[in-house]
Structure formats: C-alpha cells, structure tokens
C-alpha cells in the first residue's frame, strides 16, 4: 500500500476525507486535522504533520490565506514573499518524497462583491471587526491567478506536478461554491476530491 501526505487549508479539509476514500484501494492518505493555513505556517509545522516518514507522494496547497488583504489594502504576503516561501517549502518537502503535486488555489464567487469588508475565513459575525479582508470578485480572482501563475511556473521548472483545482471550480463556479463565496459546497468538494484523487492515482502509477 502506497503512502500519501495531503496538506492544505480548510478547503483541503473539505475534500480530504473524500480523497482518502477514493484512493483506499491503492494508498493510505495521511492528513492533519488542523488547518494548514498560509505557506509560512505550513512550512513551520510541516515536520510535525509529516512525522518521521517517507511518502510515496505529497499533495499540497497553500494560498488563500496568503492572498487576503490587510487593512492598508496590501496582501498579507506579497507575491515575491509567496514565491520565496514556496521555494523554502519545496526544499523541505523534497526530503520526504520524490513525487510531489502542488494544487492551485481556487477562485472566489460573486458574493465577494457584497462581503468584501468581511473575512469569512475568520469570523461569520459581522459585528466583530477583522483585519484580514477579501476584496471584490474580479480583484480577488485576478490576485489568485497571479499568485497561482507565479507558483506554477516555479514548481513546473522544478519538476513538481500541478493539480489545477482552480480550473475545476472555474468551469462551474457559482454551482460549486457555498454561500460564503470562498469555500466549495458539497458538489464542489466532490469535484475537487475526484480531480485530486485522479491526479494522485496517475502519479502513483508511474
């Protein structure tokens, strides 16, 4: 039985159990209960989540937390910082597996045009101020694509396979998103899980 490590934020938590079930005939899927949040946080905690184990494949994503705006209208992590953090992360991950798959960050929905002053990742109660904000849909998704492209280029050059979850969601965006405009609904999670599982299964077969 192969061993796979699956890492990512709350969206990974949403599709993780489904991925594990879909791959149960070929792999044991190890994943933390904890939200892996932004890239630096994933890097900091990676050894804790991975343990003293070598994996046949590691599949991961980080990005949505990095891309959130702070109250001076700047991203929590600049694009340059995001790329540098991913460079550091890859150096670490390579010590645990030679088969690596990085998943793109998914787009946001049109509800962001109405909720841009509130961060649904942190608190659902609008009465409480939050310092981490989203923005309107077009600006948000433009940023997601920019960060995705920068990381994709780096990872492709370095032999990491890309799992394009952005495109999976984009084709049926409003049908696959929940009411918060950031997290998928059940249909969205099922589509992401199937795509991730198919990607992992294909890479494990080589």
Region spans (language model):
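Serine-esterase "nucleophile elbow" of acetyl-processing enzymes
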Residues: 1-59, 190-191
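Alpha-helical cap/lid subdomain in secreted, periplasmic
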Residues: 22-25, 44-206
């Amino acid at each position: 039985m192969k061993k796979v490590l699956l890492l990512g934020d709350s969206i990974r938590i949403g599709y993780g159990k489904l991925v594990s079930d879909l791959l149960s005939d070929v792999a044991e899927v190890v994943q933390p209960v904890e939200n892996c949040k932004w890239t630096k946080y994933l890097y900091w905690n990676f050894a804790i989540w991975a343990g003293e184990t070598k994996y046949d494949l590691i599949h991961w994503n980080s990005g949505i937390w990095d891309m959130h705006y702070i109250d001076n209208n700047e991203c929590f992590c600049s694009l340059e910082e995001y790329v540098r953090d991913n460079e550091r992360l890859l150096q670490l991950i390579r010590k645990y597996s030679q088969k690596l798959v990085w998943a793109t960050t998914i787009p946001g929905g049109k509800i962001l045009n109405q909720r841009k002053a509130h961060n649904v990742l942190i608190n659902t109660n609008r009465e409480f101020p939050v310092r981490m904000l989203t923005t309107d849909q077009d600006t948000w998704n433009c940023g997601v694509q920019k960060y995705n492209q920068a990381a994709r280029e780096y990872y492709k050059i370095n032999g990491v396979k890309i799992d394009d979850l952005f495109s999976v969601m984009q084709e049926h965006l409003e049908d696959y998103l929940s009411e918060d405009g950031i997290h998928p609904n059940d249909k969205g999670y099922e589509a992401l899980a199937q795509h991730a599982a198919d990607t992992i299964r294909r890479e494990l077969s080589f």
